[in-house]
C-alpha cells in the first residue's frame, strides 16, 4: 500500500502525520509512505532524521496576511496544484491523508480530482477554512473533538482522537518530584513562542526563593534562544534551554508541570502523557481555536488556562508556586488529563483507511 501524508509546517500538523506513518509501517514494513510539505516548514529537518521521504510544493497561507501577500498566495495556487498533480502521478498512491497545514489543500484536492481515496485528520476543536472546504470532497474525516462534528457531513465523520506517536504513551512516572526537584517543561509549540519566552524570563525573579527546588526545561525556538539562555544564566536557575526538543515524549515524562500553548497536538500529547498543564492560548490563532482547545481540558479539570493578555511574570510565578505546594492537585489533574487521552487514535485511523482503500 502506498500512502501520501500531506501537510505540516508546524509540529501541530506534522507530528500526527508521523504517528500515522509509523502506524502504517508497524502493520507492514512494505507499506510506502511519502510526505508532501513545504520548503519553509519544519518537515525537512524532522522527516530526514526519521527516514521518511519528502516532496515539497510552493504554497502559502492566504488568510490574515495582508492584501498584497494574500494576493501573491492566491496567484501561486495554480502552481501548487500542478506540483501536487506531478508528485501524485509519479508516486501513484492508494490513499492521500491531509493532516492540515498549507500543503494539505492542494495535495488532497489534486488527489480527489485524480480519483484517489482521500481522508482528513482534523486536530482542532474548530477546523480551519481549508479543512472545512476539503471536508466536502474527501471520503472520510477523523476528528479529535466532538465539538467539531457540526462542520462536516455526519456520514463521513469518525471520532478517533488526535494520532500521537506511541512514545507519548510510555509508563507514567509515579514520583512527583524526582530527586527532590519540581520540573517545569516550558514551550510554545515546535517553533517557540516569543510571548511565553518573555513572560517566563519575567517570572524568574519571583521564582528565586524556590530556586533550589526547581528545574526548568525550556524550548525557546531559534530566534530567542541566546537571549533566553542568558537570562536563565543570570538568574542562576537550574535550567536547560534548547531551540527544539526532538524527543518531546521524554521531556513530557520528566516534567511535573507543563507551560505551553494550546495547539491541538500539544493538547493530545498532554493527555496522552497524562500531564498537568498551564495553557496560554495563542491569542491570534485563526478564529481563536486554541482557546477552544484549552477549554476542553479546563472543563475536565486537567489544566489551567491563563489568557496571554492577563499574564505577567508575577502571575505565572504564583501559579507555579501554587502547584508546587499542592502535589495532590497535580495528581488529580494528571488523572483527569490521562482520562482524556486516546491511545488508539493512530491505530483507529489506519484501520479505517485500510478498509476504505480495500472497499
Task: Write out the residue ranges for each language-model feature.
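A short, well-ordered alpha-helix in the C-terminal region of glycosyltransferases
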Residues: 329-343
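C-terminal alpha-helical cap of glycosyltransferases
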Residues: 342-359
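Acidic donor-binding loop of glycosyltransferase active sites
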Residues: 93-95, 253-268, 275-276
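Donor-nucleotide binding loops and adjacent catalytic segments primarily
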Residues: 41, 46, 50, 172-258, ...
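Conserved nucleotide-sugar phosphate-binding/catalytic loop shared by glycosyltransferases and other
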Residues: 3-8, 30-76, 222-224, 309
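Glycosyltransferases and closely related glycan-assembly transferases
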Residues: 83-96, 103-119, 132-137
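Active-site-proximal region of nucleotide-activated glycan assembly enzymes
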Residues: 42, 53, 112-173
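C-terminal "capping" alpha-helix adjacent to the active site of nucleotide-linked donor transferases
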Residues: 304-307, 311-328
Amino acid at each position: 500500500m502506498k500512502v501520501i501524508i500531506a501537510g505540516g509546517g508546524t509540529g501541530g500538523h506534522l507530528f500526527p502525520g508521523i504517528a500515522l506513518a509509523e502506524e502504517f509501517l508497524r502493520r507492514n514494513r512494505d507499506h510506502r509512505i511519502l510526505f508532501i510539505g513545504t520548503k519553509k516548514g519544519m518537515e525537512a529537518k524532522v522527516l530526514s532524521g526519521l527516514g521518511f521521504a519528502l516532496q515539497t510544493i510552493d504554497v502559502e497561507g492566504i488568510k490574515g496576511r495582508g492584501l498584497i501577500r494574500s494576493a501573491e498566495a492566491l496567484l501561486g495556487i495554480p502552481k501548487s496544484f500542478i506540483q501536487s498533480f506531478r508528485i501524485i502521478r509519479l508516486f501513484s498512491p492508494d490513499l492521500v491523508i491531509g493532516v492540515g497545514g498549507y500543503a494539505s489543500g492542494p495535495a488532497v484536492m489534486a488527489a480527489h480530482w485524480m480519483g484517489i481515496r482521500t481522508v482528513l485528520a482534523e486536530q482542532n476543536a474548530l477546523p480551519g477554512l481549508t479543512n472545512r472546504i476539503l471536508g466536502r470532497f474527501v471520503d472520510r474525516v477523523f476528528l479529535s473533538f466532538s465539538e467539531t462534528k457540526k462542520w462536516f457531513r455526519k456520514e463521513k465523520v469518525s471520532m478517533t482522537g488526535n494520532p500521537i506517536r506511541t512514545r507519548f504513551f510510555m509508563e507514567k512516572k509515579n514520583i512527583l518530584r524526582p530527586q527532590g526537584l519540581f520540573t517545569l517543561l516550558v514551550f510554545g509549540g515546535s517553533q517557540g513562542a516569543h510571548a511565553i519566552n518573555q513572560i517566563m524570563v519575567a517570572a524568574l525573579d519571583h521564582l528565586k526563593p524556590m530556586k533550589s527546588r526547581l528545574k526548568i526545561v525550556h524550548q525557546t525556538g531559534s530566534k530567542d534562544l541566546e537571549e533566553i539562555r542568558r537570562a536563565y544564566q543570570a538568574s542562576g536557575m537550574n535550567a536547560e534551554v534548547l531551540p527544539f526538543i526532538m524527543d518531546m515524549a521524554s521531556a513530557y515524562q520528566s516534567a511535573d508541570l507543563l507551560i505551553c500553548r494550546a495547539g491541538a497536538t500539544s493538547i493530545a500529547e498532554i493527555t496522552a502523557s497524562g500531564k498537568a498543564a498551564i495553557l496560554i492560548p495563542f491569542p491570534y490563532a485563526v478564529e481563536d481555536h486554541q482557546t477552544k482547545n484549552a477549554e476542553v481540558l479546563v472543563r475536565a479539570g486537567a489544566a489551567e488556562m491563563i489568557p496571554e493578555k492577563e499574564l505577567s511574570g508575577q502571575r505565572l510565578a504564583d501559579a507555579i508556586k501554587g502547584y508546587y505546594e499542592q502535589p495532590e492537585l497535580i495528581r488529580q489533574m494528571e488523572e483527569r488529563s490521562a482520562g482524556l487521552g486516546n491511545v488508539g487514535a493512530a491505530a483507529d485511523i489506519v484501520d479505517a483507511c485500510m478498509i476504505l482503500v480495500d472497499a
